[in-house]
A protein has these predicted regions:
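Juxtamembrane intracellular "pre-TM" segments in multi-pass secondary transporters
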Residues: 2-17, 191-218, 400-408
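Helix-loop boundary and gating motifs at the non-cytosolic
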Residues: 14-63, 216, 225-242
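Interfacial helix-cap and linker-helix signal at transmembrane-aqueous boundaries
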Residues: 45, 76-77, 163-168, 239-240, ...
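Central cavity-lining transmembrane alpha-helices of secondary-active solute carriers
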Residues: 60-73, 254-266
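Conserved MFS/SLC helix-loop-helix module at the cytosolic interface between two early adjacent transmembrane helices
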Residues: 67-101, 271
Length: 409
């Protein structure tokens, strides 16, 4: 079930898979759409009179739909349907935006977020599967590029939404985003299926949770998304408490996310060169130490500077976790494993956001960030143990067929 190559070798030869450009563009557009939705939540509350609970219901519904889609739809990408899933996800995203544009009642917005969340959970694993198996020699670079387009869209979305809302209001923004996404449909029809092995036995999720190193990779993923959940729950509130204006918050969020988008391709190359496990554990270990100081540094400027510094480390380490997941399964299970990984991300982020918000409300930011760091350290340690190969050699995934060393039996 595994193949090997000489120690230290690197897969060579020209890429034989499909063009990745449609996958990059569409993920960028959908991430920009998600970013625009998030930044307009306060506008919906103020203009339509929704309660905080109602807004929370809409947000939670979107995450729940993405969680379900990742588990239900991802296996289909392993059966040669990735291009169709990309088109379906994009069409659903357009429909979700239209629902948000015409909605009047809370349930309209809950429905819109459910549709858009399901769209993300449908297109995401399809894109990851194709990027992973299309060009083994440049796996790290391509996963890094996918992450860069993904994060770049999420950064661009709020900026675009702010400008459009200033011109024509929040409904105009949703209509404009729906139009922009619909313009990507011709690009979606250019997406071609990969030529890698497919899940002919229709195994789906069966057996994946018996793979020790895949479970370990999920623990490492969970460690990172404890940090993400804590960030979403605490960072903006703490910046507001320290006196940051709306404008400063917007600039800080953009500047804080840019290093991830800019450095992810290089981070992927380095992770493939030095080993995905080593790179993931090392980068997350550094982030864990840095998080402790988030509750110590004084003032708005100090917190922004530390956020940017942490983001630089995130950028270098961002591609290594999906690479570690990719290294734990054969090529015909890639989309399913990546979908399960996204489900772990969503679930961990949601639980962490709730738990750390409670800690922050009761004890302040210093205790909240220390709690985050301790939780990350525990999960990361478990993941490092479970992903450790018996021969102690670096995990350098060259997925799918020219693997340097595959960490499962």
């Amino acid at each position: 079930m595994s193949s090997t190559a000489p120690k230290g070798s690197t897969p060579t030869g020209p890429a034989s898979g499909p063009s990745l450009t449609p996958y990059f563009f569409i993920l960028f557009g959908m991430s920009a759409g998600l970013g625009s939705i998030i930044v307009l939540l306060a506008e919906l509350r103020d203009q339509l009179g929704f309660s905080e609970t109602g807004i929370g219901l809409a947000v939670g519904s979107g995450f729940g739909a993405a969680f379900v889609a990742c588990l239900v739809m991802a296996p289909h990408a392993d059966r040669g349907r990735a291009p169709a899933m990309l088109r379906a996800g994009l069409a659903l995203a357009v429909a979700g935006m239209v629902l948000l544009a015409v909605g009047q009642e809370l349930w309209h917005y809950v429905a819109g977020r459910i549709v858009f969340g399901f769209a993300l959970g449908t297109a995401g694993p399809a894109a990851r599967r194709t990027v992973i198996v299309a060009d083994p020699a440049n796996l790290g670079r391509n996963i890094g590029r996918l992450g860069a387009w993904d994060v770049g869209g999420f950064v661009a979305g709020p900026v675009i939404a702010a400008g459009l809302t200033a011109v024509g209001g929040f409904r105009f923004t949703f209509w404009a985003m729906a139009l922009a996404l619909s313009l990507l449909l011709p690009v979606a029809f250019r997406a071609q299926p990969d030529v890698a092995a497919q899940d002919q036995e229709r195994l789906g999720l069966r057996g994946l949770l018996r793979i020790r190193r895949l479970i370990g990779a999920f623990f490492i993923v969970a460690a990172y998304f404890v940090f993400i959940g804590a960030f979403e729950a605490v960072w903006i509130l703490e910046m507001d408490t320290r006196g940051a204006s709306r404008a400063v918050l917007g600039v800080a969020l953009t500047v804080g996310a840019l290093p991830i988008a800019l450095l992810s391709p290089l981070g992927g190359i380095l992770a493939q060169r030095y080993g995905a496990r080593r790179w993931a554990v090392g980068s997350l270990g550094i982030i864990t130490l840095m998080v402790i100081f988030w509750g110590i540094v004084p003032g708005v400027v100090g917190l922004i500077a530390l956020t940017v510094a942490t983001s630089v480390v995130e950028g270098f380490g961002f591609p290594s976790t999906p690479m570690l997941v990719a290294a734990a399964v054969p090529e015909d299970r890639q989309a399913t494993a990546q979908g399960l990984m996204v489900a772990v991300e969503v679930a961990t982020g949601a639980v962490a956001a709730i738990a750390i918000a409670i800690v922050y409300d009761a004890h302040g930011d210093a205790v909240a960030w220390r709690t985050t760091a301790v939780t990350m350290a525990i999960l990361l340690s478990i993941g490092a143990i479970l992903t450790r190969p018996e021969d102690r050699k670096p995990v350098r995934p060259g997925v799918p067929t020219r693997t340097i060393r595959r960490p499962f039996r």
